[in-house]
Amino acid sequence: MKPDAFIDELWSYAAEVPMEQHPWFDGIVKHRWTKEQIILGEVQHYLRVRTNPIFFGHMAINAVSAKEYTVMETVLENFMEELGGKRTHVDIMLQFLEEGGITREQADNAEPAPGTLAAIEMIIGCCQRRSALEGVAM
């Protein structure tokens, strides 16, 4: 499948369930989660987000190795969106956690839940061993 067709297919999946219908966000909006539960969930989110540079490194290597220069541009755009500029995804996560009373040190020392650890390992494995485009899709 051509990269553009694959990207279109992926966006069609993303459009099937609007973000506000995701169980996590739905629970926040409908006040099913307590403040403490939200903070604990966001600590887990932080533990995953802080590994984004690892994912992007593997994707960049795979794109260049395969001479997929348009995919490399997409990887670079994603990298800059996540890690460039004045406020990175990690910065935003840390601000949220600090407002909830969690320091960076506490977040960094938190134990990943089994699902968080599995997600991190799955994404790293995909980004290492699959195409750069499949890594971006993760």
What are these regions (language model features)?
Residues 1-25:
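Acidic, low-complexity proline/glycine-rich segments
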Residues 6, 25, 55-56, 79, ...:
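Phenylalanine-focused residue identity feature
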Residues 13-19, 32-65, 81-85, 135-138:
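Alpha-helical bundle segments that constitute or directly flank the non-heme di-iron/ferroxidase center
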Residues 26-33, 67, 129-130:
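Short, charged low-complexity linear motifs
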